[in-house]
């Protein structure tokens, strides 16, 4: 396969997406320790936000073309992520059935939006981003499923820094869906992504737990059909413009300040929308046997947990609990209706701490909901059937939604798995430099010269 050194391509590929403006704010300050490490003044891509916005990915590295859907071997995605310093593009679309954990190396840019057809699905096992420093990962679907390892997350970070995850769709974890659970993980953003349908009997959105020195940003994501931990938060955390839909008896946003250690959080302009709250779970029968049945649940309040060590700037958040098909929530006002609508006793802050980076695309909660309906998840090249189904649940505004145990059981989940993924046809790239001919023609480049990728 052809590999070419390039800096330009990482910037060009980044221009694909649904971006409103670019954040050019100076590197933010971290307490008494001076500035966070400056990984470059250039954003990871236009629209990158939060603590991970300066991730460099595979900038300056080789272009690796994924040419097949095999689990391993030359041209496979597993081979692509096995070495550092790469920009990974796709000549194929479809389902990659993972036989074992997929481990990502450092200094990678994964441009899932370059796939033809309906894009890429990673199915059947977990992925690990642990120690994958300086990672840019965009437009991938990570769907673990019932045949994945019991008690494992669909995706996770146990260590590492300077990562940004954009337009991912992460579902069907058997422990958490997507967790960052580490005292050393830092400078990480998850944005514009779906984190949904964690499988029973441990259906969880994810742990977002660091310490006070290491920041995580969760911006404009959809947590949907997870019984609990949507997410569970500890440490330095920025939670802005997210939608949480159809959580169960565990928790929507869990303020885990009652755990050891303190937290500093910004919780701004999010929408919490109650769903039908039914779930498929194991039920013991009178004869002692176990049967999977659809059971009603009693949902918790949108915020639970938290004590005086959980410090939060909490403004502009709404709660819609009437399940009537209309978005008409009430604002959660800590000084007025907190005890009525929520539980826990965090310490409320009057102003947002300066340690949190400015979110240039931040909006009010209702506009965030509208944006999420249109664009969230791995929406390029197109939104797949699973994500479309989840969005149809969300837009029912309380009338649809199920917490499932097995994605392959059509009684629980009508698609019975990942659905159909069209392969499509990759765009012509005569010189193999990772830029399609029509792009090079449009920007005055030479489609017969691979060296212009580095200009």
Give a label for each model feature:
Residues 123-128, 148-156, 172-182, 199-210, ...:
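Extracellular beta-strand/beta-solenoid scaffold signature
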Residues 43-88:
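Acidic Gly/Asp/Thr-rich repetitive segments characteristic of extracellular carbohydrate-active
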Residues 107, 112, 133-144, 159-174, ...:
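Right-handed parallel beta-helix
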Residues 324, 429-433, 437:
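Acidic carboxylate motifs that coordinate Ca2+ or other divalent cations, activating on Asp/Glu
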Residues 78-84, 95-111, 120-138, 144-161, ...:
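Extracellular beta-strand-rich solenoid/capping regions of secreted or surface-exposed proteins
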Residues 422-428, 438-455:
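Proline-centered structural pivot motif
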Residues 15-35:
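Bacterial Sec-dependent N-terminal signal peptides
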Residues 233-414:
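Extracellular beta-rich repeat passengers
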């Amino acid at each position: 396969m052809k590999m070419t050194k390039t800096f330009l391509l990482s910037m060009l590929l980044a221009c694909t997406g649904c971006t409103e403006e670019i954040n050019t704010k100076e590197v933010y300050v971290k307490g008494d320790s001076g500035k966070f490490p400056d990984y470059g003044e250039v954003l990871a891509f236009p629209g990158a936000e939060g603590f991970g916005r300066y991730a460099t990915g595979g900038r300056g590295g080789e272009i690796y073309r994924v040419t097949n859907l095999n689990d391993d071997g030359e041209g496979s995605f597993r081979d692509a992520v096995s070495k550092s310093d790469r920009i990974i593009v796709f000549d194929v679309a479809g389902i990659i059935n993972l036989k074992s954990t997929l481990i990502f190396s450092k200094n990678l840019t994964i441009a899932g939006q370059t796939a033809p057809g309906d894009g890429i699905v990673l199915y059947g096992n977990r992925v690990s981003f642990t120690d994958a420093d300086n990672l840019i990962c965009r437009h991938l679907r990570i769907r673990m499923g019932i045949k994945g390892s019991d008690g494992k997350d669909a995706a996770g970070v146990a260590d590492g820094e300077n990562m940004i995850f954009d337009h991912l769709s992460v579902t069907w974890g058997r422990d958490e869906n997507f967790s960052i659970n580490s005292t050393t993980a830092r400078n990480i953003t998850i944005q514009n992504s779906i984190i949904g349908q964690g499988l029973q009997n441990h259906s969880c959105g994810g742990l977002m737990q660091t310490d006070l020195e290491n920041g995580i940003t969760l911006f404009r994501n959809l947590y949907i059909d997870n019984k609990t931990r949507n997410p569970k938060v500890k440490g330095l955390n920025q939670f802005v413009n997210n939608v949480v839909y159809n959580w169960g008896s565990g928790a929507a946003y869990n303020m885990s300040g009652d755990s050891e250690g303190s937290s500093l959080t910004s919780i701004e302009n999010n929408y919490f929308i109650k769903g039908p709250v039914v779930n498929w779970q194991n039920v013991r029968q009178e004869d002692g046997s176990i049967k999977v049945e659809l059971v009603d649940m009693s949902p918790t309040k949108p915020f639970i947990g938290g004590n005086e060590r959980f410090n939060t700037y909490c403004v502009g958040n709404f709660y819609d609990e009437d399940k009537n098909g209309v978005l008409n929530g009430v604002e959660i006002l800590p000084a007025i209706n907190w005890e009525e609508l929520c539980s826990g006793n965090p310490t409320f802050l009057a102003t947002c701490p300066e340690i949190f980076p400015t979110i240039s695309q931040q909006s009010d909660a209702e506009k965030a909901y509208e944006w999420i309906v249109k664009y969230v998840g791995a929406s390029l090249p197109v939104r797949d059937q699973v994500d479309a189904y989840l969005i149809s649940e969300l837009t029912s505004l309380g009338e649809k939604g199920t917490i499932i145990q097995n994605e392959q059981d059509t009684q629980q989940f009508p698609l019975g798995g990942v659905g159909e993924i069209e392969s499509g046809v990759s765009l012509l790239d005569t010189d193999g430099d990772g830029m399609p001919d029509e792009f090079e023609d449009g920007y005055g480049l030479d489609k017969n010269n691979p060296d212009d990728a580095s200009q």
